[in-house]
Regions:
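Surface-exposed acidic, glycine/proline-enriched linker/cap segments
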Residues: 4-7, 122-124
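Short aromatic-glycine motifs in intrinsically disordered, low-complexity regions
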Residues: 5-15
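Structural signature for extended repeat/solenoid scaffolds and their inter-repeat hinge/linker regions
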Residues: 18-193
């Protein structure tokens, strides 16, 4: 005879709506091989860690897409797929009294900023946009090195002045021809040989 199990008297638990939590873990950045993180919910008075939570990304393909790992101490928004408490999903991050925006608000409300934070350092990389009419600006900062790879042609057009300053050495290699057209004056100062 087959064993009989009594019918379940209680429905499986469900979590309704999003919650916020604090990212926890070892060091400054803690994730597994799938980019999952650990969080602690505000109601968790014992300070227990959650299971690893998947992190929603703006793009996620096979070997391509975007990867932004929330760091320890950040406040994140957690949803539960189909309300299942065993399926947490981090859907975003929020600023709070502990973690402020990268520029003053509302004074900088016309700026869109993408700023990172150097791991175990004091610097940052940044791409920012100023959208105030008459002051529009695209700003890029590399805390250390900047590398650009172009697979075919590269074109740059400047509508007014252009300045470049190199604090150390500069080298240039041209595989074939070089053409330079100057509409007015050209001056060069060489201090050494």
């Amino acid at each position: 005879t087959a064993p009989m199990a009594p019918p379940r008297s209680m429905a499986a638990p469900r979590v309704q709506g999003p919650q916020t939590a604090i990212v926890v873990g070892e060091g400054e950045i803690d994730c597994d091989e799938h980019g999952r993180i650990l969080v602690r919910f505000h109601w968790d008075l014992d300070g227990a860690l959650s299971m690893r939570c998947r992190v929603s990304q703006s793009w996620a393909g096979n070997g391509w897409g975007s990867v932004v790992i929330p760091r320890v101490g950040m406040e994140v928004v957690v949803e539960f797929l189909d309300g299942d408490p065993d399926k947490p999903l981090v859907t975003g991050c929020v600023y709070n009294g502990q973690n402020a925006a990268p520029h003053d608000l509302p004074a900088g409300k016309t700026r869109t900023v993408w700023r990172s934070n150097s791991h175990q350092g004091q610097g940052f990389n940044e791409i920012s946009f100023e959208d105030q009419a008459g002051s529009e600006l695209l700003h890029m900062q590399a805390q250390r090195d900047h590398s650009t790879v172009v697979g075919h042609d590269a074109r740059h057009q400047t509508g007014h002045d252009r300045q470049a300053s190199v604090a150390n050495d500069q080298s240039e290699h041209i595989g074939r021809d070089n053409t330079l057209t100057i509409g007015r004056n050209h001056s060069a100062n060489v201090a050494g040989d």
